[in-house]
Amino acid sequence: MEVRVEGQMVEGQAGDSVAAILQKALSGKKFKAVVAARALDSAEELLDLSSPVPAGCTGIEPVYADSPEGLQILRHSTAHVMAAAVKQLFPKTRVTIGPSIESGFYYDFDVEKPFSSEDFSAIEAEMQRIANAREPFTREVLSRAEAIERFKAMGEDYKVEIIEGIDADTVSVYTCSGFADLCRGPHVPHTGFAKASKLMSVAGAYWRGDEKNRMLSRIYGTAFADEKALAAYLKQMEEAKRRDHRKLGRELSLFTFKEDVAPGMVFWLPKGMLVRTILEDFWRKEHLKRGYDIVQGPQLLRVETWQKSGHYDHYRENMYFTQIEEDAYGVKPMNCISHMLIYGNELHSYRDLPQRYFELGVVHRHEKSGVLHGLLRVRQFTQDDAHIICAPEQLEGEILEVIHLIRDLMNLFGFEYKVAVSTRPESSIGTDEAWEMATSALVQAVEKAGLPYTINEGDGAFYGPKIDVRLLDCIGREWQCSTIQVDFTLPERFDLTYVGQDGERHRPVMVHRAIMGSLERFIGILVENFAGALPTWLAPEQARLLTVTEAGDEAVSSMLEEFKALGIRAQADTRNEKLGFKVREAQLAKVPYILVVGEKEVQAGGANVRLRNGDNLGLKSVAEIAALIRTDAEEPFKQGGMRYSFA
């Protein structure tokens, strides 16, 4: 048989392993970096290197350890190595599940005494011993009955429960270093690939995410293809700790959380609410400028409405429900239904299209307690949600305009970003023709915008394909942000129409889009990206006046009024404290302009200007200081099509 590998044809024999074929095509160095392979046939399945080449396979694509797919496999294998180490050290531990996740892996254990970070050194040492031994991952296929019998004999009740819930005649089991685990695979060839690993944290997690079940001990870890990549990641994580928005939000008095009262929901403090209000006001003005109408829908809609939309069938696990008198209601997890009902409130002509509805809408989505994370993962949040209802021939142009809005926002904050087009998932509604037309419109708009993009197969919404935009912050982390979704199905379900030039009724198409996504999440990202030192235009306090002695109180009071009249957010610190102490407090509060008023400054009618980074600009008049702050606040807006105005 002949098999194509990276552009060359390789001769092989029936029954040859994937490894045997790859060794003929790749150099020794390249082959050593391969963790698995993809069979390029109709199934395109991932294979272990020890697997035989499937019959009829025309090509094999090697999966390298440092590729996104390779890292996922490597991390999953390292989770097995960690579980093997834990079982060696703590034999009475029962194992549950251990998947790879975005930046690493975890494994949940049922253990008498929950693990702590103090256990890490022993577990990591055992993991390194296993890695150094380069023990193979071996795969065997068992009948369900055989697998149940084996795991029962091992005392692994959780694995038995999982197997009993699998609707298949056979299951696969992988073994490394004497540890057998139920797993689909594939896995790395041997444990030596798990050398560049690190345990990161511990947490509690309920079995199957159900609070009624037993609390398990979860160990998080990460792994990379080499020590250099691991070291770079650990350095990034140290910087991330310094920038953690939960820590900075507390230190800067922006927001707080009360987990005992409202888990997954934010309490905005005055300074944080000011930041949010500034951002919201700017964003509303920007949308009005771009032809959007601002609307608002109710928080509760009858359950029948969510059944009609399809959300009840496809999304109800993420929704909250309540009862009012005899009727069941769903708390809205998104705003699209209200916007369609607003559109349907009156008859529309083709001359009215496109209709662009914008809402800073509060939504609620049920997230499991284990995944809640400050502002970044909450249960109540505000979406900068818009729905564009247009004629099919207007679709591509409208998508392009949304892409331009995303680009302008990213440029405003200096973010680089990545674009992906997500296609039809397995669970979906709508016709094949509608999905193809919608996907084509998204791809063409992205290409017209000149943006590089990738395809995420099967990752679209249940009602339509989408564009996902992930921004990159200053330390290289990616964050899911903007989304554009095309929907032919919901306008059909809610019987949306417009009167065309021919006098007949026609069906419009709808674009769902959010640019910041969740305002809470976006503010959390901004706080971390700028390490709390928000851009001057967004800072809750743009300037702080500091007196040296009581003699400066009157002058500071007068300056404060002048700044406020000019729309500059300024405060005064006239406490009887040492100047150095007050300067340090202003710097810790990330105030952009620190204005010192002593005897000399009082006589000159100005202030000594210090920046939060420590630079000293010397004595300036109130007018000069106001001009500095204005210029600084307006600077980010010069690059794009957005505008900033002082209140």
UniProtKB/Swiss-Prot annotation:
Cofactor: Zn(2+)
An example Gene Ontology biological process: threonyl-tRNA aminoacylation
SMART domains (UniProt xref): tRNA_SAD
SUPFAM superfamilies, per the entry: Class II aaRS ABD-related, Class II aaRS and biotin synthetases, ThrRS/AlaRS common domain
Keyword Chloroplast: no
Class of this enzyme: ligase
Cofactor note: Binds 1 zinc ion per subunit.
Main location: cytoplasm
Region (Catalytic): 244-535
EC number: 6.1.1.3
Single GO cellular component term: cytosol
UniProt xrefs under InterPro entries: aa-tRNA-synt_IIb, aa-tRNA-synth_II, aa-tRNA-synth_II/BPL/LPL, Anticodon-bd, Anticodon-bd_dom_sf, TGS, Thr-tRNA-ligase_IIa, Thr/Ala-tRNA-synth_IIc_edit
Matching Pfam families: HGTP_anticodon (PF03129), tRNA-synt_2b (PF00587), tRNA_SAD (PF07973)
Catalytic activity reported: tRNA(Thr) + L-threonine + ATP = L-threonyl-tRNA(Thr) + AMP + diphosphate + H(+)
Keywords carried by this UniProt record: Aminoacyl-tRNA synthetase, ATP-binding, Cytoplasm, Ligase, Metal-binding, Nucleotide-binding, Protein biosynthesis, RNA-binding, tRNA-binding, Zinc
Domain TGS intervals: 1-63
A GO molecular-function descriptor: ATP binding
Protein localization: Cytoplasm
Record bears the keyword Ion transport: no
Domain of life per record: Bacteria
Homology family: Belongs to the class-II aminoacyl-tRNA synthetase family.
UniProt function note: Catalyzes the attachment of threonine to tRNA(Thr) in a two-step reaction: L-threonine is first activated by ATP to form Thr-AMP and then transferred to the acceptor end of tRNA(Thr). Also edits incorrectly charged L-seryl-tRNA(Thr).
Full protein name: Threonine--tRNA ligase
Species of the source: Desulfovibrio desulfuricans (strain ATCC 27774 / DSM 6949 / MB)
Source lineage: Bacteria, Pseudomonadati, Thermodesulfobacteriota, Desulfovibrionia, Desulfovibrionales
Gene that this sequence comes from: thrS
